[in-house]
A protein has these predicted regions:
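Radical SAM enzyme core and accessory elements
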Residues: 2-10, 31-32, 36, 47-48, ...
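A short, glycine/small-residue-rich beta-strand->loop->alpha-helix junction that serves as a flexible
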Residues: 11-21, 65-70
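Flexible glycine/acidic-rich beta-alpha junction loops that bind and position SAM and/or redox cofactors
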Residues: 14, 146, 190, 239-241, ...
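Glycine-rich beta-alpha loop elements in corrinoid/cobalamin-binding modules
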Residues: 26-31, 35-154, 373
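Active-site beta-loop-alpha junctions enriched in small/polar residues
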Residues: 66, 94, 234-236, 266-270, ...
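Catalytic cores of alpha/beta
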Residues: 100-106, 279, 339-353
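N-terminal [4Fe-4S]-dependent radical SAM core
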Residues: 138, 142-181, 503
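Radical SAM [4Fe-4S] cluster-binding motif and immediate context
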Residues: 162-329, 350
Length: 520
């Protein structure tokens, strides 16, 4: 009897399709053990087509589940069971930890949940299913046994990541972003109260060998011609001196091999502020075009709430340091949370305006989501801002200590939502850095004028957004229930700035296309 395994990640729309390293690693590991397996990223519209396409339906289907894909995964599981009631469905991913029993109690089509690193656990799960053995004592698996739910002990994390084969990549034509993810480590040392990464990541930070990382990047470049790499490491320089030495080794290895790659990676404010200029000079030379920094807030009250262990001035210093080395700063920012006050929102606006960051209305309207493993979720339960929390609870539905702040946010959010511009702004900024550095003559002759126009629009938009939201707060406080506030927030020019940026982006990408084809 053949035993075929399919692994899936579910996304909202085809435009969201990209790599998911978890299922890629598991697929490659299972294949190295002789099992027949594939992995796919699909959206809702593709579910039926994919399930109908199997000549021999999988005996085991594994699905990555996250809080924001919960309803899609529920729907997919229901469809799977209609096609094949005997197919074993296992869910996994960072957000399932501590909610394994809850998931099985509330999702009747799911047979088991995998906790922690999935490679060895899914392999043993498959082996037991193949040989029709009990799942009792299968480490890392919580499973349904008739009317009972049995939770086995967690499997120890894979400490030596270099023993894992490089994940196979399948260039998906729907992936328009044209970059590969690189997982150089697993685990996180951050203790942010809104996040559970430090719980789900396992035993501290586990590092891969820097030479092996560069080998993987070079192999992908030779095979697919892709020179852009985004590191998934929670913090590229962790842990401590060992992590910093590894980061420098990766940079040095890239430079010595003369590999002209474009790199994006995550870091933290307190890491940036303890590094010296030589590190960022080396990063720039190695091809780092963007550091994603967990800024999160521009006021001290929220930074303390998020347990960031930094100050507003620390954030400003870190931003300046990276920008001064001609590296773009992308950033996490949570402007609204259940404890927000208008004073703190105004401080966030002041911070963004004076920070030197590129920002749009999405940054200003960003609202905290409840991560299942976060300590802030526990505080919200204690403060009765949420009545209860399950894995399928709405991660954006909670009360505010100051309900008028939520009312303000909801009113504007209905009118303005420009999430898509985060990627666009970042892409523009990174392209400017890349071509100014690597093709200065072409940049000066063909691109400089357009990027200067974009810079002007960014500056004008920053100024407009600051004044627009500052005035909106003032009017709301004075005329909360009147027509003046609603009239004011509707009569805005935000979309005009966004359209200008989109037009200029398309203008320079046409030039880049012709340039690559030898036309300019």
């Amino acid at each position: 009897m053949s035993f075929f395994i399919s692994l899936f990640s579910i996304v909202d729309t085809p435009d969201d399709v990209r790599e998911y390293m978890g299922i890629s690693y598991i697929k490659t590991y299972l294949k190295s053990k002789g099992l027949d397996c594939n992995a796919r990223v699909i959206c809702k519209e593709e579910m039926d087509e994919v399930l109908r396409s199997y000549e021999d339906f999988p005996k085991l289907i594994g699905i990555s589940i996250y809080c924001n894909t919960l309803e899609l995964v529920k729907l997919f599981c229901e469809k799977i069971k209609k096609f094949s009631p005997d197919c074993h469905i296992v869910l996994g991913g960072a957000h399932v930890m501590e909610y394994e029993v809850d998931i099985l109690s509330r999702m009747k089509h799911v047979d088991s949940v995998c906790t922690g690193d999935g490679e060895e656990t899914i392999w043993e799960l498959a082996d037991r299913l193949i040989h029709q053995k009990s799942l009792l004592n299968c480490k890392g698996i919580t499973f349904r046994d008739g009317d009972k739910i049995i939770q086995n002990e967690r499997r120890p994390d894979i400490k030596n990541l270099d023993l894992l084969p490089h994940p196979e990549r399948e260039r998906n034509p729907k992936n328009k972003k044209r970059y590969f993810y690189i997982t150089g480590s697993r685990g996180c040392l951050g203790q942010c109260s809104f996040c559970g990464e430090h719980k789900t990541g396992g035993c501290g930070v586990r590092l891969r060998d820097p030479v092996d990382i560069v080998n993987e990047m070079e192999e992908l470049w030779k095979q697919y011609g892709v020179d852009k790499f985004h590191f998934t490491d929670a913090t590229f320089e962790d842990p401590g001196n060992k992590g910093i030495e590894r980061a420098q080794k990766i940079f040095t290895e890239l430079i010595e091999r003369q590999l002209k790659f474009r790199l994006v990676m995550y870091t933290r404010t307190n890491i940036i502020n303890k590094m010296n200029n030589k590190y960022y000079d080396l990063a720039y030379k190695a091809g780092v075009e963007c550091f994603f920094v967990g800024v999160e807030s521009g006021n001290q009250g929220d930074l303390n709430l998020y347990e960031k262990k930094i100050t507003v001035q620390d954030n400003l210093k870190a931003i300046r340091t990276v920008l001064e080395h001609h590296i773009y700063v992308n950033y996490g920012f949570i402007c609204f949370n259940p404890y927000s006050t208008f004073e703190r929102i105004q401080e966030n606006l002041d911070f963004l305006y004076h920070s030197g960051l590129v920002y749009n209305s999405y940054h200003i309207l960003s609202k905290m989501t409840i991560m299942p493993q976060s300590s802030l979720k526990d505080k919200m339960l204690e403060d009765k801002l949420i009545d209860e929390f399950h894995f399928d609870s709405d991660i954006r539905d909670y009360k505010f200590v100051h309900p008028e702040v939520l009312e303000f946010h909801s009113a504007i959010y209905k009118i303005i939502n420009t999430k898509h511009l985060i990627d666009l702004d970042s892409q523009i900024a990174i392209d400017r850095i890349h071509y100014r550095k690597n093709e200065p003559l072409f940049y000066d002759q063909q691109l400089k004028g357009i990027f200067e126009e974009i810079e002007d629009v960014w500056n004008s938009r920053n100024h407009y957004l600051y004044n627009y939201f500052t005035e909106a707060i003032r009017i709301f406080k004075m005329d909360r229930n009147g027509d003046r506030f609603n009239s004011y927030i509707k009569d805005n020019k935000i979309s005009e700035y966004d359209k200008k940026i989109t037009i200029l982006y398309k203008k320079y990408t046409i030039i880049l296309y012709k340039h690559k084809k030898g036309g300019v």
